[in-house]
Curated annotation (Swiss-Prot):
GO terms for cellular component: bacterial nucleoid; cytoplasm. It comes from Pseudomonas aeruginosa (strain ATCC 15692 / DSM 22644 / CIP 104116 / JCM 14847 / LMG 12228 / 1C / PRS 101 / PAO1). Its main location: cytoplasm. Disulfide bonds: none annotated. This is Nucleoid-associated protein PA3849. One of its GO terms (molecular function) is double-stranded DNA binding.
């Protein structure tokens, strides 16, 4: 992972309304194994978080970040100057937010594959212990990437090459509530463009409809469900969106356009690229069971809506039966 530029600044700030104090670094971080390890660990932690996706607000006095980033990329200002301008803006926003807490601010411009990214993260320390060369236990401070709550990643290549994109920025949804992370989102100047949970739910609904329309056997439906969930999970793990083209090809290598064409013909309104929402995906695993000539299979998210389990009476109640099954039952009754 080539790292083009990286720098760290420090903002001291407590969530009590006290002024934010900036300690700015005046030179980039040099190449080292430590910074490579830091960025690798940061990406691993970041990819595991639930994120929102969006795009830059129109450049203005309230949202100047995209303008500074553009000037840096065009060579009109160096990386240190860009990061200094940005962190001073962040300092002001922190002072306006009583809930904000300071920390070390990492700016890193790096490349992964053929794609350029800018990562920005607010890092905090944790107190721990270590054993020194004299085999004594001593206090030790380290960056705690497990407590990463405020961070954003900008896909620079997507931003510059695809003007229609509305999902080239991702940022962590703060655990402390919307107001805690609002100032950081405003710092980036990001407007949410894609509702990841909603898009994921729509994709899963389209998949369920597709499986029903194809009248797939239970085993085939289960295999395709696993294919979808595995692909979506792997993309979420590396912080990349799913693409409908790639997913359709994975579904059926003999008819690689079948699922894609079904989605487009039914007009589900899905974007070509969909950020996977892991919580939504986890509800989509299938329940299956066989006994004495009976075979039951349904997606986990249907439990509690179309499927109800009555444990005391050892019963499953199924609502909205498939049309084909109802027709068979009616013919048998007649």
């Amino acid at each position: 992972m080539p790292i083009h530029h990286a720098i760290v600044h420090l903002i001291e700030k407590k969530p009590d309304g006290t002024p934010a104090v900036l300690h700015a670094r005046d030179a980039e971080l040099g190449d080292s194994q430590a910074i490579e390890n830091l960025l690798a660990d940061l990406n691993e932690s970041y990819n595991a978080k639930n994120k929102a996706w969006g795009f830059f607000q129109g450049e203005s006095g309230a949202y100047p970040f995209s303008g500074w980033l553009g000037e840096y990329l065009e060579g009109d200002r160096d990386f240190v100057g860009f990061s200094r301008e940005a962190v001073e803006h962040l300092q002001k926003l922190m002072e306006e937010s009583n809930l904000s807490t300071g920390g070390h601010i990492l700016f890193a411009h790096y490349q992964q594959g053929m794609t350029d990214y800018l990562a920005i993260a607010l890092l905090h320390h944790s107190e721990g212990v270590a054993v020194n060369e004299s085999l004594e236990v001593t206090p030790s401070r380290h960056l705690d990437l497990g407590q990463l709550h405020l961070a954003a990643r900008i896909n620079i290549s997507e931003w510059r090459n695809n003007k229609q994109s509305k999902q080239y920025i991702s940022f962590i949804k703060g655990k402390g509530g919307k107001k805690v992370s609002d100032y950081f989102r405003d710092f980036i100047g990001c407007q949410e463009g894609v509702d990841s949970p909603s898009e994921t739910r729509t994709l899963l609904k389209a998949f369920s409809d597709f499986v029903e329309s194809e009248d797939m056997a239970e085993e085939q439906a289960r295999e395709k469900t696993e294919t979808l969930v595995d692909y979506a999970t792997s993309q979420a793990r590396i912080g990349e969106p799913m693409t409908l083209d790639a997913l359709s090809e994975l579904m059926d290598d003999q008819q690689p356009r079948a699922f894609y064409d079904y989605i487009r013909n039914k007009d589900y309104g899905l974007s070509p690229e969909i950020p996977a929402d892991k919580r939504t995906l986890n509800q989509f695993r299938r329940f299956t069971g066989r006994a004495e000539g009976l075979s039951i299979s349904f997606e986990a998210h249907l439990l509690g809506s179309k499927v109800e389990y009555d444990e005391e009476r050892d019963m499953l109640i199924i609502r909205q039966l498939p049309t084909q099954l109802k027709d068979q039952l009616k013919r048998r009754k007649d």
